[in-house]
C-alpha cells in the first residue's frame, strides 16, 4: 500500500473517510490473484454463483438505509436518489443470480448443405479470464454492481477500481461478497 492518502469528503467539506491509493505492486498482486483463481471461478457451479449473488442482493436489501446514507455521505447525492441506487443494485444482483443459472451452451443445427446433413454444432460459453471494472463517482454502488454481478454470474474473477472520491459503497459490497463461498 502506498503512503498516498485520499480524503473522502462530503460536499460540505466534512471528512467521511480516508483510504490509501494502491501501488503498482498492489495492482499486480490483484491481477495475479485473479488469474490464480480463474479456473476455480470458472468451474464454480451455477447454483453456487447464484446463491452468492442472492446473498449479496439480500444483504444490500437488509442494509438498504445504511448503504444509501453512505452513498449520500461520500458523494453528496440526495438521500432519495441514494435509496434508488441501492434498490437498483439489489435488482442487479438478483437479475445476475437468475442469469447465472441460464449461462450455458447450446446446440445448433449446422446442416445447411448436403455434406453437413444431420450435424449439430455445440456452442459452449465460458469466461476467458479476469474482468477489470472501473467505476465512476456518480453511481458508486450501482455501476460497481453492473460490473461485479455479471462477472460473478458467468464465473469470471473481477478486480474493481471504484472512484477515489466514492469508494465506501464498493468496499461494503466487497465485505458482503467476502461472506460468500466464492473463490478469492
Residue ranges and their predicted role:
Residues 1-19, 51, 55, 87, ...:
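Terminal low-complexity tails and localization/encapsulation signals of metabolic enzymes
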Residues 4, 37, 75-77, 99, ...:
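Glycine-rich, flexible loop/turn motifs
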Residues 5-7, 68, 175, 179:
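A general secondary-structure boundary signal
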Residues 6-7, 28, 70, 83, ...:
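N-terminal hydrophobic or amphipathic segments with adjacent small-residue motifs
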Residues 7, 23-26, 40, 111, ...:
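Serine/threonine-rich low-complexity intrinsically disordered regions
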Residues 13-104:
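Glycine-rich loop-to-alpha-helix module at the N-terminal edge of alpha/beta enzyme cores
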Residues 108-184:
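Rossmann-like NAD(P) dinucleotide-binding subdomain of oxidoreductase/dehydrogenase enzymes
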Amino acid at each position: 500500500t502506498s503512503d498516498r492518502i485520499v480524503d473522502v469528503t462530503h460536499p460540505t467539506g466534512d471528512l467521511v473517510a480516508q483510504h490509501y491509493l494502491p501501488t503498482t505492486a498492489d495492482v499486480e498482486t490483484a491481477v495475479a490473484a485473479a488469474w490464480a483463481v480463474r479456473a476455480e471461478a470458472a468451474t464454480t457451479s451455477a447454483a453456487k454463483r447464484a446463491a452468492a449473488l442472492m446473498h449479496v442482493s439480500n444483504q444490500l436489501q437488509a442494509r438498504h438505509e445504511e448503504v444509501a446514507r453512505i452513498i449520500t455521505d461520500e458523494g453528496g447525492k440526495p438521500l432519495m436518489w441514494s435509496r434508488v441506487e441501492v434498490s437498483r443494485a439489489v435488482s442487479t444482483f438478483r437479475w445476475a443470480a437468475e442469469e447465472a443459472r441460464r449461462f450455458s451452451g447450446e446446440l445448433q443445427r449446422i446442416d445447411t448443405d448436403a455434406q453437413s446433413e444431420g450435424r449439430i454444432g455445440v456452442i459452449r460459453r465460458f469466461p476467458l479470464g479476469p474482468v477489470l471494472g472501473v467505476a465512476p463517482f456518480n453511481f458508486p454502488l450501482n455501476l460497481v454492481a453492473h460490473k461485479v454481478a455479471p462477472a460473478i454470474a458467468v464465473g469470471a474473477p473481477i478486480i474493481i477500481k471504484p472512484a477515489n472520491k466514492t469508494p465506501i459503497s464498493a468496499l461494503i459490497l466487497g465485505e458482503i461478497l467476502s461472506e460468500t463461498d466464492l473463490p478469492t
